[in-house]
Amino acid sequence: MARMHARKRGRSGSKRPVRKEVPEWVQYTPEQVEQLVVELAKKGYQSAQIGLILRDTYGIPDVKLITGKKISKIMKEHGLYPKVPEDLLNLMRRAVNLRKHLEQHPKDLHSKRGLQLIESKIRRLVKYYKSKGVLPADWRYTPETARLLVEQA
């Protein structure tokens, strides 16, 4: 698939093998995996980071295979998922950092263009999340709300 704001092709890479059953070498029960996810979420890790930690340190290839639930669903069940979705929060974090940079370097036109692209991605995601009911219908993106949300998170 192509990139959103470039005329280049997308990234290719290896794909995860399609598995329908839990590998026999995994020695964790679904309850243990769920408990690990909750512990890591309480430490402040995002769901993507939790997946990497479980894969690299605990040898758990896929949480959904073992528990039947995605990491984000486990976090939502225990009330640990953030109010604003993580992908939107990460984009807002990038926009806030770029705004700080542009305050010190106002003539950096390449970064100014990058900020425009990031904010257009944010607006796209906000539109999607409003239609899905994840965000309230009157929620609006402004640089100030983004700064407050990033500082809070």
UniProtKB/Swiss-Prot annotation:
Part of the 30S ribosomal subunit. SUPFAM superfamilies: S15/NS1 RNA-binding domain. The keyword Cytoplasm does not apply. GO terms for molecular function: small ribosomal subunit rRNA binding; structural constituent of ribosome. This is Small ribosomal subunit protein uS15. Belongs to the universal ribosomal protein uS15 family. GO terms for biological process: translation. It comes from the Archaea. PANTHER family: RIBOSOMAL PROTEIN S15P/S13E, SMALL RIBOSOMAL SUBUNIT PROTEIN US15. Residues 1-18 have a biased composition (Basic residues). It comes from Methanocaldococcus jannaschii (strain ATCC 43067 / DSM 2661 / JAL-1 / JCM 10045 / NBRC 100440). Residues 1-20 are annotated as: Disordered. One of its GO terms (cellular component) is cytosolic small ribosomal subunit. Keywords: Ribonucleoprotein, Ribosomal protein.
